[in-house]
């Protein structure tokens, strides 16, 4: 893999990885809150309020990381386009030119507006409507990332298909990652609560497991479409830097699916049975460990996404 020793723009790759990860996690935490935590904890209003508060705080932190890394990404992108240093890029007004005259800039402005809307909704989080609007804004924030990558430069009907696949891919990834972040929060609250949460935790895990299965199915389907557009052939997958890194990404994703399968087929039933007997410690410990491993693997994938976004698609390199 020559990309390992090539001159990769490390700061840009890392910034993209952090930004993609934080944006996806922001949406994912809100998905987890709305579709998993709140329905599962209806029988424990006090505990539900604590979990919702912590998840909202986590969404705030992730939104700040997303906004900060987005500004850094804009600066790095301006430096790359204009061939300027950081000080010159800021003082010369080149960043405003990028914002006003490029697709990247237009998408950045739209996403900034969505981030402001999301922040406003989080401030009014005690009301139902802002909570729902926050989820939509967060999904828009992560979905619009599709227009910053290769999909944004694919033309015609194929471009529409590419964008749709990218949006689905990003949304499904967000839902999965949100659960990986949200479950430990729920477990931490349960561990320090006097309320008997065994059955409620089991219900939350079951709900997230269902979302996880759907997310994996969407990731595989949309990923196949994206690979068909950007790679095009098995030979291109094997002989190009893009294809080889994509194979590594697929291998890491398959490992994540393996851990998710263990959680779904083994640990979730164990947790449900243990909840009835009150002996769920071992199942919870294994689930927490697997969740942490999946999060580490997810960040590794975002690093690869950061690199892939800087490489020429394989289909353009093999004839």
Predicted regions and their residues:
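Polytopic transmembrane helical bundles with strong interfacial aromatic enrichment
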Residues: 1-319
